[in-house]
Each structure stands twice: as C-alpha cells, then as structure tokens.
Amino acid sequence: MFSASSLLAVIALAISSVSAAGPSAVPLGTAGNYVILASTGVSTVPQSVITGAVGVSPGTAASLTGFSLILSGTGTFSTSSQVTGQLTGADYGTPTPSILTTAIGDMGTAYINAATRSGPDFLEIYTGALGGTTLLPGLYKWTSSVGASADFTISGTSTDTWIFQIDGTLDVATGKQITLVGGAQAKNIIWVVAGAVNIEVGAKFEGTILAKTAVTFKTGSSLNGRILAQTSVALQSATIVEK
C-alpha cells in the first residue's frame, strides 16, 4: 500500500513524464539570434519598437531604412532609437558579413525544414479561415492562402509545439489578434509561409514567421516572436518583441 508521500511521488513522476504534444522543434540555428532577419531589406515608418537584433544580407546598410542609423566606432554594427539590439548589414566591418551569411543560410535551412514536414495532423482545416477557431498542437497544412477576419486562439501547454505550413499568403485583418491559452508560448509556434504575409492595422500576432517572400506589419500592429524573411520586411509603427 502506498504511503501519502509515495503516492505524491508517483503522481509527480507521471506528470513529469508526459510528452509535449506537436511536431519536433524547427532548429533556427544562428538565425535565432535575430528578431528580424531579411535578405533584401528592412524598413520602418517611425516610430516602431523592436526588441532584439535586426540583420540584412546580402542587403547593405542602405537597405535598413527609416531607422536613423548610428554607426558604431568599430564599424561592425549600427544602433537606432527604435531597436534595443544591434542592426547589421552585409557591408559592415569584419566579422559581420560572415556572421550574417551564416544566419541567412540557417534561415533558409529552417524554412526548408518546416515547409517540408510531411504527414500533417490537420489538412486544409477550416479552409484556411482561422477567425473564431481554436488551434491545438500539431502540424497544419494549407495548399492555399490563410486568413483571420476575427480573433482566434492557440491552445496548449508551455512545451507543446505548432507548425503552420501555408502555400499561399497569410493575412490578419485590422484589429484582430491571436490569444495564447493553457501556457502556450510564442517561441513554440512556427508559421512557414510561401506567399506574402500581411498583418493589418492594430492586429496582434504570435510566433516565428519563416517567410519565403515579404512580410508587412501595419500601423499599431504587433508581434511576439520573430520575422525571418527571404526577401523584405516592412514595419509601419509596429511593435516586434523577440520570443
């Protein structure tokens, strides 16, 4: 017969042994050192608020627009009143170019890893109309565009994971938001999008965006996560917080 202390120990072990739900994590490599990373450019319409580092390559400092860059004494990075971290481009001093080249390569590898996962748990669910839905942990696949014309929820624990594979565009309507419940964390959510990503005015988004093309966050919109884009990122007085 179990003593009270033994029973509690068994319960604790059972709880600790529960596996996280959802697909295995997508390795970001050194791309994970950036809150925004892009190939051709990053623009802002001031004032945006960005927590983390911003990088562009093979784009140069000239493709970091709207930031009022202040070049460091070493010439290896710049700063901006809109960004808590460093801003870097491919024409900065050594070793910045090689660091960025590696990060861009890691971004491409992460995109392929996420986009080519097979055997989705949810295929074409809600025909891509996410407004009003609740999304549980898992691998999701849409062969067309995805949008949210109303708020929606992502529900799971702090260790659960989500990968959303979208072959078309991703659009979130004005003022709509994602709510995380049950302990779900933005760092465990991956959106891998082949088409353009457009987050409208005042919308609130969660997760890492791995984008094949361009990403736009409009006035008053926000992101808890990262933007890793293989072309450009445009911010219009947006708030981007690294998660």
Curated annotation (Swiss-Prot):
Effect annotated for changing S232A: Slight increase in thermal hysteresis (TH) activity (0.48 degrees Celsius) compared with that of the wild-type (0.32 degrees Celsius) at 0.14 mM
Induction remarks: By low temperatures, 0 degrees Celsius.
Range of residues in the leader sequence: 1-20
Disulphide bridges: none
UniProt entry keywords in alphabetical sequence: Signal
Entry's family note: Belongs to the ice-binding protein family.
Protein known as: Ice-binding protein K3-B1
Species of provenance: Typhula ishikariensis
Gene label: K3-B1
